[in-house]
Amino acid sequence: MKKIIFCFLYLYTLNVFGASKIDHNKLNSCSITRNIFNNYEPKVFETTNNLLRKTGTLSKFYGEMILIRGKILDQNCVPVTDAKVYLWQAGNGGKYPYEPLKTRVDKSRFTNKSDSSFTGSGIATTNNKGEYYFISMLPYKSPRYLRNANIRIEHPNLTTLETRLDLFDKNMCDNECGEISPILIETKKNIPSYCFDLVLQGTTLKRY
């Protein structure tokens, strides 16, 4: 009887360690970024990643220039290439400088009478490393409205994500990362950067 019990425990131990080895070979798993929705997205997005001006015009804005950047990953931590990234935010005065998509919103949050070139919206496409970046400005801060931007990521193979980016000191980049336009770096030094790595539900790698 003791021999039978010993053999059973031995085989069970082999199965446990065998399963653990298989687990170690699995792809990494990233925590999926949660959705936080915003009702103030624009009716029409500007088609550039520079929110400080329209394409072909000079920039004239009132506030501090910043970079918003990071990586888009799938749930296996694989960088997502060619994802469409939409960003929108209020300007220095706390208002959105465009016409909203939705009609049942607080109209006092919008303005079309500013002499600033700040557009409040833009679009970027991730590179082959899953990286994106936007040129923007630090939004208005008050007891009622915190400094944040809104982002939506779309990819044909992944679940669309919409969330909020809190522009707090804790989210500032620790070091230089990602590919940024050399023209921007040459003309402006020490631009405050906020980094956000976002994870979408789904996988981009095909199984064969």
Swiss-Prot record:
KW Plastid (keyword) present: no
Instruction: Identify the keywords attached in UniProt to this record, alphabetized.
Output: Dioxygenase, Oxidoreductase
Nuclease as a keyword?
A: no
The record's annotation in Gene3D superfamilies points to: Aromatic compound dioxygenase
InterPro entries, per database record: Intradiol_dOase_C, Intradiol_dOase_core, Intradiol_RC_Dioxygenase
- Enzyme Commission number: 1.13.11.-
Domain of life, per UniProt, equals Bacteria
Q: Which GO terms describe its molecular function?
A: ferric iron binding; oxidoreductase activity, acting on single donors with incorporation of molecular oxygen, incorporation of two atoms of oxygen
Q: Which PANTHER family match?
A: DIOXYGENASE, PUTATIVE (AFU_ORTHOLOGUE AFUA_2G02910)-RELATED (PTHR33711), INTRADIOL RING-CLEAVAGE DIOXYGENASES DOMAIN-CONTAINING PROTEIN (PTHR33711:SF10)
Belongs to which family? Answer: Belongs to the intradiol ring-cleavage dioxygenase family.
What is the name attached to this protein's record?
Putative dioxygenase RP396
